[in-house]
Amino acid sequence: MVCGESNAAAISAKYVDNDPLQRPAARATPANESHICDLMPPKGWKKDAQGNYPTTSYIKEQEKLTVDDLLFPRSIITSLAKDAVHQAVQTAEQDPRVMLSKDASLALQRSSTVFVNHLLMHARQIAQSNDRKSCSGEDVLKALDQIGLAGFESVVRERVVEYEKEVQRRRAEKTPAADEGQAEEGDAADEEEGSHKRAKLDEH
């Protein structure tokens, strides 16, 4: 009787192994688990506006970024540096010609990028402490004080005021031009309407 039961159990087990429908669901293997982990974003990644995590390809692209990819344009940094030195030289009544070597331009490019990101990090912390998502100009000025550069606050304020005045001046110059364009379009429309009215009168 025992032998019969053991034989029946063996036959049943063989039948289950040969029939895919009777096989129990296989547990995820470590390889499958690692594959699932690869699909999940690293800790700290946030969802986008659609509620999706960054794709694996996007994460890999971010991992491939180097310091050179994050640097400010060298031409702009060099131009700003030359303007600053040019103003200082003119004040001292010296030769206004300014020459920057390749190494000097590279040093300015790298240092300016690091400085701005360091300053912005402190400005963001100040904004977050006030329950704000975006940084304001005052946050940046307070950040200057936090990193020990409070002496530049007055200079930055002056530059901001100059920039705002320049923006307003350019807007004021564009507004009359836009008004003139609208006036010309209105005159053309009036002339066209008048010609249509004259044509109708002639028909009558």
From Swiss-Prot:
Biased composition regions of type Acidic residues, renumbered to the chain: 181-193
Biased composition regions of type Basic and acidic residues, renumbered to the chain: 165-177, 194-204
Positions of region (Disordered): 165-204
Signal peptide: none
Keywords linked to the UniProt accession: DNA replication, Nucleus
InterPro entries reported in the protein's UniProt record: CBFA_NFYB_domain, DNA_Pol-Epsilon_Subunit, Histone-fold
Location(s), subcellular: Nucleus
Disulfide bonds: none
Listed GO biological process terms: DNA damage response; error-prone translesion synthesis; heterochromatin formation; leading strand elongation; regulation of DNA double-strand break processing
GO terms of molecular function: chromatin DNA binding; DNA polymerase processivity factor activity; double-stranded DNA binding; nucleosomal DNA binding; protein heterodimerization activity; single-stranded DNA 3'-5' DNA exonuclease activity; single-stranded DNA binding
UniProt xrefs under CDD domains: HFD_POLE3_DPB4 (cd22928)
GO cellular component: CHRAC; epsilon DNA polymerase complex; nuclear replication fork
Cited function: As accessory component of the DNA polymerase epsilon (DNA polymerase II) participates in chromosomal DNA replication.
Cross-referenced PANTHER family: DNA POLYMERASE EPSILON SUBUNIT 3
Miscellaneous note of the record: In eukaryotes there are five DNA polymerases: alpha, beta, gamma, delta, and epsilon which are responsible for different reactions of DNA synthesis.
Subunit description: Heterotetramer. Consists of four subunits: POL2, DPB2, DPB3 and DPB4.
Protein name (record): DNA polymerase epsilon subunit D
Organism of derivation: Eremothecium gossypii (strain ATCC 10895 / CBS 109.51 / FGSC 9923 / NRRL Y-1056) (Yeast)
